[in-house]
Amino acid sequence: MRLNFSLMIESAIKQYLAKTGHQNLNIKGVMFDMDGVLFDSMPLHAEAWVKTFTQIGIPFTKRLVYMNEGRTGAATIDEQFQIHFSRHSSTEEQQEIYHIKSGIFKQMPKPGLIPGIIDVVRYLADNNIARTVVTGSGESSTLERIEQNFDGLFNRELMVTALDVKQGKPYPEPYLMGLHKLRLSPNEALVVENAPLGIQAGVAAGVFTIGVNTGILDKSDLEAAGANLVFDNMRQLLEALPKIVQQ
């Protein structure tokens, strides 16, 4: 492993320990976001959200989709209503608009896997490190695809979805729930994210949080959200994992 790469990781761990007050980082589990981390689905979600909001007269960009990723659909809709209509959206409006978005998304091609993610998850499994998924999605069909594409690598009962929490990302509740399901302390886990709100949630939960920039955002967007480390792709994450897990 390159010396400067190792030093970067060591420095990030030292900063995390100094900030949190933990004595060590003893990794026993990893919590993955889903869209943009497991599946290359964010371009499809971005297109679906832009089309949906356009139908109801709300200007929305693909960058905004990426910046809002991790937030529940209801929260995303409500925020846009406040910005553009100066009021909260009703539950009925949220359900109707999300139904439109889901309909558009379901007509799109099925997304493939993020390159290299299978190797990352298998490395963890081979080293007896627990794995789970923490997602703002609540669609059962998507969760079923995790089981289909990651055969035996994830336990559905350990997954955290929008249906499990009251406050989604950027609040820490999703990752605190993940820790609870894995029965781990914050310094015994990692969060792997691709979006600012998810990174904020992981950091707020006190977990060492890694950003992998698989989308259209700048690396600085993930750093500004508080990521302890930011990588360009899963290959870099795989290279770093032994240093993080075995340090």
Question: What are the residue ranges of the model-derived segments?
Answer:
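Asp-based, Mg2+/Mn2+-dependent phosphohydrolase catalytic module
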Residues: 1-28, 118, 122-125, 138-247
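N-terminal helical cap/lid subdomain that shapes the substrate entry/recognition surface
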Residues: 3-34, 38-127
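Residue-level marker of regulatory loop/turn positions in helix-turn-helix DNA-binding domains and
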Residues: 113, 134, 167
